[in-house]
Curated annotation (Swiss-Prot):
InterPro entries: Arg_succ_lyase_C, Argininosuccinate_lyase, Fumarase/histidase_N, Fumarate_lyase_CS, Fumarate_lyase_fam, Fumarate_lyase_N, L-Aspartase-like
Similarity-based family: Belongs to the lyase 1 family. Argininosuccinate lyase subfamily.
Keyword Heme tagged: no
Name of the protein: Argininosuccinate lyase
Keywords from the named record: Amino-acid biosynthesis, Arginine biosynthesis, Cytoplasm, Lyase
Gene Ontology CC annotations of this record: cytosol
Pathway membership, UniProt: Amino-acid biosynthesis; L-arginine biosynthesis; L-arginine from L-ornithine and carbamoyl phosphate: step 3/3
Taxonomic classification: Bacteria, Bacillati, Bacillota, Bacilli, Lactobacillales
């Protein structure tokens, strides 16, 4: 029987067949962690040297080899072998080819369990910075767009029915606030990602006199995990990221859904740049909002990665299990998906054209000013419920007569209630309706300008 030549092969008499090896290998995707694997190894071997577990000479020789590997990796000169299973074994084999048997000492006081957890913490810590940067850019684009459209009037909707006129900037600021909370969630995620598993070993720590705080400091983590079993067993920091990413994608998807509607022939509120649209292979007139649709579609993809890892984790006993190999691809894909989606959404918003006249016109041919009349009557002392009933009858009669509220004469309006006077026509104007809603958080122009000013100050402070 052939001898098992794996780095872990001493306990085995037989070998793993090639097709089984392919099933179990992860190098096809976990090679994304190569840089972080080397960085983690550099910190580990420095710690081994400084604590006397290895001699300083041994530590320095291993560091030289690792740094050469890092240079070759960055130059695209490393080839990985599926026979070595994963990125950790591949890097150790490559290091052995470079510096000989001394490479075997690198794994002293370390397991692949804490090694992979460290790699993933380092990877996600870096990516969270990119996500937050792109979110900040998107929020800046939103603020610039909102600042230019405080006085642009559009219908506000409930149940996809015209509800009340609002400022377009006000609508944009609603999304700004959603994206701001997304930023805050990712910032909190950073706290849980900024923990160092290195030195936890397989699950129970190690008998070697390691210095986990030193390893943590060298890798610029805030602190080590306080429980080694926890450090290698859980992936909640990834689940938290996937959850946050799912909420972010949901917010982007809702925004894209609205833009898809707004650029349709029925709305014509906005025109998307040619850069973010495509045509039809059969219908020459088409200009399809494909990029917005793709963001909407990719939202389900990110949801799937969250539910996939939740399902993987739900019944895992402590500590490490091979199931955890399934924690990476969804994380990698989610990072790529949200970074690209943030770029595309920011690009769409910075280049779209707003059709102000069409938005304004749509508020003049509906009954979104009905609440104004009800509030007008209530402001004159009529109980709101009575005012609501009066205006409801007037709306019904207007529909039957094919009229808008402002089309009725004063004498006709007064047949519905005597409290109505000549000034009602000012109140029924969409712009007046918007201006008057100056309660905190309202759509009044002063309130929207205040919201934008506060948001710009906060956004600038984060840069």
């Amino acid at each position: 029987m052939a001898k098992n030549t794996k780095l872990w092969g001493g306990r085995f008499e037989g070998t793993v067949e090639d097709w089984v090896e392919r099933f179990g290998a992860s190098i096809s995707f976990d090679q994304k962690l190569a840089k972080f694997d080397v960085i983690g190894s550099l910190a580990h071997v420095q710690m081994l040297g400084q604590t006397g577990i290895l001699s300083l000479e041994e530590s320095e020789k291993i560091q030289v080899g690792l740094k050469e590997l890092l240079e070759e990796l960055e130059a695209g000169q490393l080839d990985f072998d599926i026979a070595n299973e994963d990125i950790h074994m591949n890097m150790e084999v490559l290091l052995t080819e470079k510096i000989g048997p001394l490479a075997g000492k690198l794994h002293t006081a370390r397991s692949r369990n804490d090694q992979v957890a460290t790699d993933m913490h380092l990877y996600l810590k870096e990516q969270l910075g990119y996500v937050l940067d792109k979110l900040a850019h998107l929020k800046g684009v939103l603020l610039d767009l909102a600042e230019n459209h405080v006085a642009t009037i559009m219908p506000g909707y409930t149940h996809l029915q015209h509800a009340q006129p609002i400022s377009f900037a006000y609508h944009l600021m609603a999304y700004y606030n959603m994206f701001q909370r997304d930023s805050e969630r990712f910032e909190f995620n950073q706290k849980h990602t900024d923990l160092c598993p290195l030195g936890a070993a397989a699950l129970a720590g190690t008998t070697f006199p390691i210095d986990r705080q030193l390893s943590s400091d060298l890798l610029e983590f805030k602190q080590p995990y306080t429980n080694s079993l926890d450090a290698v067993s859980d992936r909640d920091f990834i689940l938290e990221f996937l959850s946050n990413a799912s909420i972010l994608m949901m917010h982007m998807s809702r925004f894209c859904e609205e833009m898809i509607n707004w650029c349709s022939f029925e709305y014509q509120f906005i025109t998307l740049s040619d850069t973010f649209t495509t045509g039809s292979s059969i219908m020459p007139q088409k200009k399809n909002p494909d990029m917005a649709e793709l963001i909407r579609g990719k939202t389900g993809r990110v949801y799937g990665h969250l539910f996939g890892l939740l399902t993987v984790m739900k019944s895992l006993p402590l500590a490490y299990n091979k199931d955890l190999q399934e924690d990476k691809e969804g994380m990698f894909d989610t990072v790529e998906t949200i970074l690209n989606s943030l770029d595309v959404l920011a690009g769409m918003l910075s280049s779209l054209q707003v059709n102000k006249e069409k938005m304004q016109e749509s508020t003049e041919k509906d009954f979104s000013n009905a609440t104004e009349l009800a509030d007008y009557l209530a402001g004159k002392g009529l109980p709101f419920r009575e005012a609501h009933e009066v205006v409801g009858r007037l709306v019904l009669d207007s529909i039957k007569s094919a009229k808008n509220l402002q089309d009725w004469t004063l004498e006709e309006l007064q047949t519905y209630h005597s409290l109505i006077t000549e000034d009602i026509y000012v109140y029924l104007q969409p712009k007046t309706a918007v201006q008057r809603r100056n309660s905190l958080g309202g759509t009044g122009f002063d309130q929207v300008e205040y919201q934008i000013a506060v948001a710009k100050k906060a956004n600038e402070a984060k840069k």
